[in-house]
């Protein structure tokens, strides 16, 4: 089984299922979708609550992420039909997580400095992007949207938007980013960017072939823009990355912090789904 863990239960699965339908993503095993329904720092706190306090070098060592998620879902009354299909952790060969950067200013609710928040995200990346769970291609990978999942439609003109590499927002924009996207985006709705979902979380496929072709072409542009932007963040070259090693999630975070957060208190707009597509789906197609 391959487990997908999404921060939210609306935009993320909608995008993933649209891309899978249009580009025929072929996964080697059955997929399971789970919605965490909380932010990346809640994920950190949840995992830490199961860690061994005596192990200061690697507090996440020996954490069974699947059992942690099951217990979290039960304790917080979250739907977990997908997780219920997993009887034993060893049944899952790969896990992919998609979360927002979601940095917040220090206030009465958040006591963590921006440096402490970045440190926690870096710890999660280190844990998820190096942990193996038992099989040859197995592992866990965390992908981060900057600043949020809605970054997938942050463009000002009809695609492709050649100015995409320069788009940034204030690092503390938080939930206001959604309204900013609505005001900024050339498309005022998502009709030509993704399909809708029904009440059963199933994709409502369009019978309009022209619409399907437009969505598909738009995502080819979005993929290209985000791959070039990731490479620009990491290497200062707005071009296709020479390899996936150039634009690892850790490299992206480190360069976001150094070049944007620390210098300008900004974050460069970047969406995680094209990076997952490039890093995993394209490679999987080559292997099959």
Please identify what each model-predicted range represents:
Residues 2-23:
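Short, acidic loop-beta-alpha module within alpha/beta folds
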Residues 17-34, 44-288:
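C-terminal accessory helical subdomains adjacent to catalytic cores in phosphodiester-
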């Amino acid at each position: 089984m391959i487990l997908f863990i999404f921060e939210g239960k609306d935009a993320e699965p909608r995008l993933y299922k649209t891309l899978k339908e249009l580009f025929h993503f072929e996964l080697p095993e059955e997929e399971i979708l789970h919605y965490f329904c909380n932010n990346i720092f809640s994920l950190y706190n949840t995992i830490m609550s199961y860690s061994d306090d005596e192990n200061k070098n690697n507090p996440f060592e020996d954490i069974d992420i699947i059992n942690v998620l099951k217990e979290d879902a039960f304790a917080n009354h979250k739907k977990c039909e997908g997780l219920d299909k997993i009887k034993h952790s060893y049944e899952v060969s790969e896990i992919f997580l998609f979360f927002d950067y979601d940095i917040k200013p220090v206030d009465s609710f958040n006591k963590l400095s921006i440096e402490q928040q970045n440190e926690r995200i870096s710890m999660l990346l280190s844990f998820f992007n190096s942990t193996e769970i038992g099989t040859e291609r197995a592992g866990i990978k965390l992908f981060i949207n900057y600043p949020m999942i809605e970054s997938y439609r942050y463009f000002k003109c009809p695609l492709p938007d050649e100015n995409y590499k320069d788009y940034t927002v204030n690092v503390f924009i938080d939930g206001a980013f959604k309204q900013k996207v609505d005001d900024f985006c050339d498309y005022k709705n998502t009709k030509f960017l993704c399909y809708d979902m029904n009440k059963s979380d199933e994709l409502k496929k369009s019978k309009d072939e022209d619409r399907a072709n437009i969505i598909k072409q738009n995502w080819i542009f979005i993929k290209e823009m985000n791959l070039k932007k990731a490479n620009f963040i990491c290497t200062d070259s707005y071009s296709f990355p020479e390899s996936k090693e150039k634009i690892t999630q850790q490299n992206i975070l480190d360069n976001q912090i150094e070049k944007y957060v620390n210098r300008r208190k900004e974050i460069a707009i970047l969406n995680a789904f094209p990076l997952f597509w490039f890093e995993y789906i394209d490679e999987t197609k080559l292997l099959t």
